[in-house]
Amino acid sequence: MILAFTEDGSVFVFTKQEDACREFEGIDVENGVVTFYDDAGTPLRPDFIEPNQQGRSFFIRWVVSGKYRLVRDPYTEQDPFWLALHESSHLEPNSEFEILDDLKRHVAAKGAVVDPPDSSD
C-alpha cells in the first residue's frame, strides 16, 4: 500500500505503486508537492527512470514530466511519517479507509509511529 501526502493536507491511498506514480506528475514529485510512504510508515523516494525536462522557447517555459518508481528509503530527509500524518486534514476517497483515524490505526498496527515523540524527556 502506498500513501501519498500532498502539500495541501490531502492523503491519497493506493494499493498499487503504478497507480500512485500515474496520479502524480514527476515534476510535482521532484518539487516536493507530494511525498510518499508505505503503510508501515517507511518513506518512499522517487527514483527517476526518465528525468523531468524543462526549457524555454522564447518567452514560453515548457516542462515534460519524467517517469519514476518509488523506492523504500528509511534514511531520506523527508518529514517523519507521524509529522506528515499530523499535518494532514483530508483523506481522499479510497477503497481501504473511510476516515483518517482508520488509516492511523492501520499503520500503527504495522509498527508506524503515528504520534509525535514525547518532548517531556
Language-model region placement:
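Short, extreme N-terminal segment that most often corresponds to the first beta-strand
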Residues: 1-18
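A short, sequence-level motif marking secondary-structure junctions
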Residues: 15-22, 50-53
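Long, charge-rich C-terminal accessory regions
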Residues: 24-26
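Low-complexity intrinsically disordered segments
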Residues: 30-121
